[in-house]
């Protein structure tokens, strides 16, 4: 664990601070992705300069994976001699933001992507 922990933290830091394709953590803790003609989710159709399925913003599945990754980091941290509490705290905030942003009570389902 001590060998892979630095790599896991670098990945976390890049997502939090921002990386290519507009991927970054927003103020609410959710991940934003996509810019211009970049398609960064599994719905990556592009026909020339036209995006039939644009999903720029906060895609639901990316943020579900983000939440899960934070919980995993919290559990792995002690095995690497690190404190997992900050990851749990961020995951709590992400979970609350996820429910606010994605849950559609009137339809009883989740939104696909939010701005």
What are these regions (language model features)?
Residues 13-32, 54-56, 65-115:
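Catalytic cores of carbohydrate-active enzymes
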Residues 34-58, 115:
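Acidic/His metal-coordination segments adjacent to aromatic residues that form catalytic metal sites
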Residues 8-9:
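Phosphate/pyrophosphate-binding betaalpha-module
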């Amino acid at each position: 664990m001590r060998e892979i922990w630095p790599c896991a933290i670098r990945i976390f830091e890049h997502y939090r601070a921002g990386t290519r394709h507009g991927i970054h953590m927003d103020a609410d803790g959710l991940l934003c992705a996509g810019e211009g003609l970049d398609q960064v989710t599994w719905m990556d159709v592009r026909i020339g300069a036209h995006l039939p399925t644009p999903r720029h913003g906060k895609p639901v599945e990316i943020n579900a994976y983000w939440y899960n990754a934070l919980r995993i980091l919290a559990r792995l941290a002690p095995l690497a001699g690190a404190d997992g509490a900050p990851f749990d705290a961020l995951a709590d905030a992400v979970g609350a933001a996820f429910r606010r942003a994605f849950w559609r009570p009137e339809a009883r389902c989740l939104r696909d992507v939010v701005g």
